[in-house]
Structure formats: C-alpha cells, structure tokens
C-alpha cells in the first residue's frame, strides 16, 4: 500500500529511529516501567512487533526473556542485528515483515508488544487485522501491550516548538484533531500516522476480542513541560515520575499525554 511505502521510506532514508528513545528518555522510562508490570519471573516468550531497532527487545532479552523482533523497515532489522553483535545480546529472531501477517505460530507467545504499528495504520480495518494477528499468536491468558499516539499530541508540539506560524503544520494539526489522520504532505514532519482517542483505543481492543485490562498515559501531564531539567537530576526525576504515576489514569488528564498505553488479555 502506498501509505506504508511512504512510512517505510521515511524510516529507511529520512529519520534516525535508532536513537529515538535516547532523544525521548521520559517516554522510554515510562514504557519500560509499564511493561514491567506484566513481566513474570519465569522466562517469557515475547514478540516485539513493529519494534524498530529493538530498544525494547534487547532490554527484555537482557532480562532473560526469549524475544522475536519484527519490523516493516529493512534498515531497522539490519541495525538491530548490528546492535546485537556490538552488545552481545541475542534475540531469537530478527524478521522483516508486516504486522498484519505475522510469520509466527498460533499460541506461541506469552506477551505481544505493539509499540508502533497501531499509530502507523490509518485504516481501521488494518489496525483490527494487526490486533487479530496479535491475538492469534498469543497463548490463552497472554497479554498485549500497545503504544498509541494521542489525538491531541500535536497541539503541544505546535505550541512548544513554535510551529503555529507554519500554515502547513496548522493544516496537518487541524486534520489530526478532526479525523485522527496525520498526513505530512510535502513537509519534513512526522510520517503518515493515526492519532487515537482513548475511547477508540478501547473499542478497537475489544473488537479484536481482547479483554480490556488497563489504559494509562505514558508522559502524562509532563507532555506540557520542558522535562530536561527534571530528568537531569535524580531527585527531581523521581518526583516527576511519582506524580505521573499518581495521575496516569485520571480521565481529565489523559488527553494531555503524547502517548497512551493500552493493555489487553486473550
């Protein structure tokens, strides 16, 4: 599909995904913290679908879990293999493929991560197919954890980064808010994407037959802050994280967060 070729080209030749989590330390910290709530002491079989260059895959493998990484962009898989060789941590497999058609056996995994696919699929039928594939490859009682972009994320990006004088950005933002569609046109902004509302996220998980477990904000109210000074000091960082945790489920605050995480069970 044209949309996914555009997305693949963005990651293949325009954007360095390999150090994205270094550039977004609060998002990375919070994602690991939330994922950790669903990890067992026993060795788990985990599929990191759309896992890019393996930021979460290698973190999980380092803890002793068996991890298969899949991503749509060939460069990401090549970079993951290079990283594996440099840090001495092996994943079970490195697969270049489509999240809607997984190359795995039914009932293979204890945990499936979808930390990117749902926010790159603009068509609901594609998102549901992706979720149904995750359902298929999970064991009974297996857990799915999905990261999605908030419908309102670009409001904060626009005002924090002085983009509101850019007419094209404003056009993109207005489409985000009205329909959830993010189309970069001929700009250098983020690639083709879909921005969820909280209720739509819950609906799609349930349509794919998952039992809903939880939905939390990732950055929470900190999305509206310049967090560098809070994260550079250990004491301030712990204070920030403490209050993000305290407010991560408050309905009135969910829309502020740049990203949400939804958890379901097979």
Where does each model-flagged region fall?
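A short acidic, Gly/Pro-enriched loop at the edge of an enzyme's catalytic core
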Residues: 100-112
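A short glycine-rich, Lys/Arg-flanked "PGG" loop and its adjoining helix->strand segment in the class I
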Residues: 128-140
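C-terminal lobe and adjacent flexible extensions of AdoMet/dcAdoMet transferase-like proteins
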Residues: 208-266
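Class I SAM-dependent methyltransferase SAM/SAH-binding core
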Residues: 55-101
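Acceptor-substrate binding/catalytic loop of class I
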Residues: 121, 185-199
């Amino acid at each position: 599909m044209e949309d996914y070729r555009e997305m693949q080209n963005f990651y293949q030749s325009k954007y360095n995904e390999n150090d994205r989590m270094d550039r977004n330390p609060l998002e990375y910290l919070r994602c690991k913290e939330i994922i950790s709530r669903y990890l067992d002491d026993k060795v788990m079989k985990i599929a990191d679908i759309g896992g890019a260059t393996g930021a979460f895959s290698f973190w999980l493998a380092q803890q002793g879990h068996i991890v298969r990484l899949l991503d749509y962009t060939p460069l990401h898989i090549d970079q993951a293999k290079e990283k594996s060789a440099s840090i001495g941590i092996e994943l079970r497999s490195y697969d270049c493929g489509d999240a809607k058609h997984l190359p795995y056996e039914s009932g293979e995994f204890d945990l499936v991560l979808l930390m990117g696919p749902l926010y790159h699929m603009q068509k609901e039928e594609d998102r549901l197919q992706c979720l149904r594939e995750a359902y298929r490859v999970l064991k009974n009682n297996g857990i799915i954890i999905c990261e999605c972009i908030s419908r309102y994320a670009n409001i904060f990006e626009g005002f924090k980064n002085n983009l509101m004088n850019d007419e094209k950005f404003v056009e993109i933002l207005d489409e985000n808010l009205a329909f959830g569609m993010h189309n970069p046109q001929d700009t250098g902004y983020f690639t083709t994407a879909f921005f969820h509302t909280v209720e739509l996220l819950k609906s799609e998980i349930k349509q794919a037959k998952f039992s809903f477990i939880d939905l939390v904000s990732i950055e929470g109210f900190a999305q509206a802050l310049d967090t560098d000074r809070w994260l550079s000091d250990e004491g301030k960082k712990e204070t920030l994280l403490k209050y993000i945790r305290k407010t991560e489920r408050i309905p009135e605050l969910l829309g502020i967060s740049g990203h949400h995480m939804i958890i379901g069970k097979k």
